[in-house]
Amino acid sequence: MKNTMNTPVAIPVSKLHPFEGHPYKVLDNEEMNTLIESIQTQGILSPLIVRPMENTTDEYEVVSGHRRLHAAVKAGLETVPAFIYALDRDAAAIAVVDSNLHREHILPSEKAFAYKMKYDAIKHQGTSSQFETKQRSDVVLGADSGESRAQVQRYIRLTYLIPELLTMMDEEKIALSVGVELSFLPEQFQYDVLEACEMNDCTPSYSQSWHLHQYYKDGALDKYLIFKTLSEEKANQRETIKVPVNRLRDIIPEGFTVKQTEDFLVKAADYYTRYLHRQRDRER
């Protein structure tokens, strides 16, 4: 089956397969429901892009259009329009990533595995007519995605995280910088981190994850040290009391620094507490 004069052809959905290692999630959410309704009323307006699968007859791998294919199946379509291109694995991998990279909402885990896929493909291609010069793969990838080489490397590091920690990143429970530091820990230590988080009902800070990474590099990390580090109170978890400045303006001496003000209030509270105790003693 071939497309003639660059026109799409109708391909049975049973002959289409997701791209191996496809890094983007296809979710049954509100956006998917909207897409299904659109396909039911208008059909597929933008044809898929597919490539012939090796060692098969009339079987195709989806390069662009995984969500459209999923929605089409949900909508009950038996065939979908698609352009067929004879792409090799590397060119197809790059196209898979590029076709989704500028979506409005991309999860950190999706971006991590997308960057890794494209990085490996560019590296495997070597000198390519597409890029013309022998640049570092992460430099090329960074230029294509609008991110620095260092940021590309950080995202690729996330592919070394266990699935549970990646999910925490996707749910914005831990920051990118935290995930990068934890990615250097062996899998078992990462599961120890996860267990410590669950037991202490906490998430690691950058400082804590950085220290865990350093302990591991020094050969000192063990489960006890992981639990000890993550059980320590973080600065952003300490209880604080906020008092509007206008309530203190007539109390605090003029020209006091923040530190002097804090010390003054602590001493004033201590003095007032002792005063109340003396008053109670007199009333007895």
Task: Please annotate each region the language model reported.
Residues 1-85, 91-102, 272, 283:
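Short, charged/polar connector segments at secondary-structure boundaries
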Residues 20, 70-160, 184:
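Amphipathic, charge-rich alpha-helical segments that serve as recognition/docking helices
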Residues 42-46, 125, 130, 190:
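Glutamine-centric residue-chemistry signal
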Residues 126-129, 200, 279:
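Secondary-structure edge/capping motif, primarily at the C-terminal ends of alpha-helices
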Residues 149-270:
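Amphipathic alpha-helical extensions and coiled-coil-like segments
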Residues 265-283:
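Conserved TIR/SEFIR loop-to-helix hotspot centered on a Trp-containing motif
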